[in-house]
Amino acid sequence: MLSRISERCTAVTGLEQVLCRHVWSAAWLRDAEPAAAASQSIDLSCLMERAGLAAYDVFASLYASQRHWLILVGSGNNGGDGYVIARHAREAGRKVTVLSMPHSKPLPTEATNAQHAWQAVGGTETMINPGTSLHLPTDVDLVVDGLLGTGISGPPREHYEEVIRHINALPVPRVAIDIPSGLNAETGEAAGACVKADHTATFICLKPGLLTGQARDYVGQLHYRSLGLEEWMIAAERMDAALCRRVALGDVYGYFSTRRSAVAHKGSCGKVVLIGGDHGFGGAILMSAEACLTIGAGLTRVLTRPEYVAPLLTRCPEVMVTAVETETSGQLEQQMVEAFEWASTLAVGPGLGTGAYGQAALSAALQQAEMHQDKTLVLDADALNLLAERLHSKEMGAAVGAGKYLPVLPNSIITPHPGEAARLLACRVADVEKDRLAAARRLAAILGGTCLLKGPGTVVHCQSSGKTAIVDAGNAGMASGGMGDVLTGLLAGLAAQRMMHDTFDTTCAAALVHGVAADMVAAEDGRGTRGIRATELIPRIPFIVNASVPSSATQQRPSGL
């Protein structure tokens, strides 16, 4: 069933497939390019030639029937790549129109050399005049974006914005060199106009802005090419410089290659307690419980309101359910003491509410988790909203200043969506989305554990190890109620089984299963992403966690950086 899903990033060689599981900052690459070229005994102009040819090969294979290419070149080395592509397209017999942006400074040396090589084969270009209407040939059937590269931060300048908006409106395919113009290579922010590419060819290493933030609206299918630098990039010095991991479809086999022991029993496969489901919110805790069971937890117990006992047992008779009658008599606190003594993993939040029940549950969970540091505590949904209230409570001002108002819980996992993240960080949602990696680091520091920041290009960060990952799975169909509740169940159930190396790997693996399950639903019989329900993910989970390793697979168990 996994074979129905396409990888979001293509790579050709085995080493490229390894390298595209890692992400480096664009700034690091700019500094490293001279050494990369020197390792091949070539100069930067030759490296640009490799990049342009690699991009041309990708685009020509995708659009073999497109005969008139419009190539837009900017004033930097991204434009230099465009000149190389133009030359190869012309030499292959295609009609090529090159439009260049005005620039007040000379082109970089490498771009100048590429421009001269284009002119040497008879190529011409037309400079775009700001403020004048952009007139394009009517028979153009492919647009190649070489306007802005990986160095941009903030919105494109006005005349670049005008050109970008114009080409986005053209009814023809668009492809981007290295990164779509207008997209921040470090964060995935599109602060202004941004080219909406159908395909993007990127070189030497993946950059975070291609994978998270607003990237999925603009990058299209990603194609990674190492330009012959695989051996240089795979060396320890370069791997140690990587910013984070990219967790993707192929990692399923690494995470779940270990089969369950033939002599396993329910007690050895993990015990989970889920706490939630206040009055009116029973569906959330039910979905969490079902997901927890389906990913393989040995025993699952739920603490919830009395009215949800019967529905839970009807839907999931395998679950043990305890009714929470009242939160004022100490009943819930005692139940939480017993839960932490019994379980290996606890999750608080699905359908919890922010009333007295939720407040009592969170208080008891934090207190018990501090006393049971070996247990994993997952906090989601209203548990996070209540945590934010604690964090920013005026009554706790003195404690906030002293840093003693929340315990340090290295085995905790928080799973905020951008709205919950903004409340935890006392900022705007836009501030979270502006730099999701930075936000995840700040969020993980709140309890000293692991943060899973939801959204396209989910970001996972572990405070204690410093490891970060971007989970490149899932789709827009996950923008519906209940998805987070399913994820909470997956996290709790997987953590309880102690299959992974650490909490970071557990969090990455659960997020991957969640995203791949949604991709499986979308891929079935041309289903698509609109109208996917959270409960539809659950039946797909066993096919993911029990996936057989393909005979050609070379993936090893993923490890964080």
UniProtKB/Swiss-Prot annotation:
It comes from Leishmania braziliensis. PANTHER family: ATP-DEPENDENT (S)-NAD(P)H-HYDRATE DEHYDRATASE, ATP-DEPENDENT (S)-NAD(P)H-HYDRATE DEHYDRATASE FAMILY MEMBER. Residues 29-235 form the YjeF N-terminal domain. It catalyses: (6S)-NADHX + ADP = AMP + phosphate + NADH + H(+); (6S)-NADPHX + ADP = AMP + phosphate + NADPH + H(+); (6R)-NADHX = (6S)-NADHX; (6R)-NADPHX = (6S)-NADPHX. Its cofactor is K(+). Residues 77-81, 149-155 are annotated as: NADPHX 1. Residues 417-423 are annotated as: NADPHX 2. Binds 1 potassium ion per subunit. (6S)-NADPHX 2 binds at G351, D485. Bifunctional enzyme that catalyzes the epimerization of the S- and R-forms of NAD(P)HX and the dehydration of the S-form of NAD(P)HX at the expense of ADP, which is converted to AMP. This allows the repair of both epimers of NAD(P)HX, a damaged form of NAD(P)H that is a result of enzymatic or heat-dependent hydration. Residues 249-561 are annotated as: ADP-dependent (S)-NAD(P)H-hydrate dehydratase. Coiled coil: none annotated. The keyword Transport does not apply. This is Bifunctional NAD(P)H-hydrate repair enzyme. Residues 1-241 are annotated as: NAD(P)H-hydrate epimerase. GO terms for molecular function: ADP-dependent NAD(P)H-hydrate dehydratase activity; ATP binding; ATP-dependent NAD(P)H-hydrate dehydratase activity; metal ion binding; NAD(P)HX epimerase activity. PROSITE patterns: YJEF_C_2, YJEF_C_3, YJEF_N. Its EC number is 4.2.1.136, 5.1.99.6.
